[in-house]
């Protein structure tokens, strides 16, 4: 079977559901401003975080900008989110190719699809959001150089979830030598991971773990 990154993102929804820090999620919910709110998600993939927030009723009335640099992801999001919404009992209105509305009596969310590198998107100087989301994405960026530009996308709140912290554990131990080799090779790919971000924007590439002082960081 040919590898499909959108299929991978779709298949791991339940894994991410369980991995998200619910204490941080409760804190986020308590600090969100009154609706409607403006949300920007970078590295948004096919939109599984958006549908998760709708399922969990964290987002009820919002403008949601879904940003990803992979054309395949954005195309899948355009097609999959309406199908998901119908199955969830939500109404769907296609306003434009890249503007979708999903709604019912309790929820009304307008979704804009942006196929762009995150720093190209930032250079457009979009209006800051009430909430910035980056899910399993920060470890793709050079840090700390990229953080001021990324955080300029939000007025105050940032929910930056499931980030590689430089540590890998394989359990249970079956072959310690093999585990060590797998860990070493995996960490090498994280240290040298090529992205289009580094080609078009000048940053010093490193693999330092993200250290956050805000309660909005989810580990």
Regions inferred by a protein language model and the residue ranges of each:
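Class I SAM-dependent methyltransferase Rossmann-like catalytic core
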Residues: 1-34, 46
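Conserved S-adenosyl-L-methionine
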Residues: 43
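Glycine-rich SAM-binding Motif I of class I
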Residues: 47-51
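Class I SAM-dependent methyltransferase SAM/SAH-binding core
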Residues: 53-120
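Short conserved loop adjoining the S-adenosyl-L-methionine
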Residues: 120-126
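A conserved beta-strand element that flanks and buttresses the S-adenosyl-L-methionine
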Residues: 133
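A short, conserved alpha-helix within the catalytic core of class I
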Residues: 140-154, 162
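Conserved catalytic/acceptor-binding region of the Class I
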Residues: 156-219
């Amino acid at each position: 079977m040919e590898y499909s990154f959108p299929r991978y993102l779709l298949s791991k929804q339940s894994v991410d559901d369980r991995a998200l820090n619910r204490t941080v999620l409760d804190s986020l919910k308590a600090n969100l401003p009154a609706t409607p709110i403006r949300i920007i998600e970078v590295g948004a993939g096919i939109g599984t975080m958006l549908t998760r927030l709708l399922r969990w009723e964290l987002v009820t009335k919002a403008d949601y900008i879904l940003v990803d640099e992979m054309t395949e992801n954005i195309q899948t999001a355009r097609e999959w989110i309406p199908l998901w919404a119908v199955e969830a009992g939500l109404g769907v209105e296609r306003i434009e190719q890249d503007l979708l509305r999903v709604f019912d009596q309790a929820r009304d969310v307008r979704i804009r699809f942006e196929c762009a590198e995150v720093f190209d998107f930032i250079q457009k100087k979009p209006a800051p959001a009430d909430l910035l989301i980056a899910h399993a994405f920060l470890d793709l960026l050079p840090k700390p150089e990229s953080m001021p530009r990324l955080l300029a996308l939000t007025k105050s709140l940032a929910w930056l979830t499931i980030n590689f912290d430089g540590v890998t554990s394989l359990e249970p131990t079956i072959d310690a030598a093999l585990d060590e080799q797998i860990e070493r090779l995996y960490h090498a790919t994280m240290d040298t991971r090529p992205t289009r971000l580094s080609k078009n924007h000048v940053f010093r590439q490193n693999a330092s773990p993200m250290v956050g002082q805000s309660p909005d960081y989810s580990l």
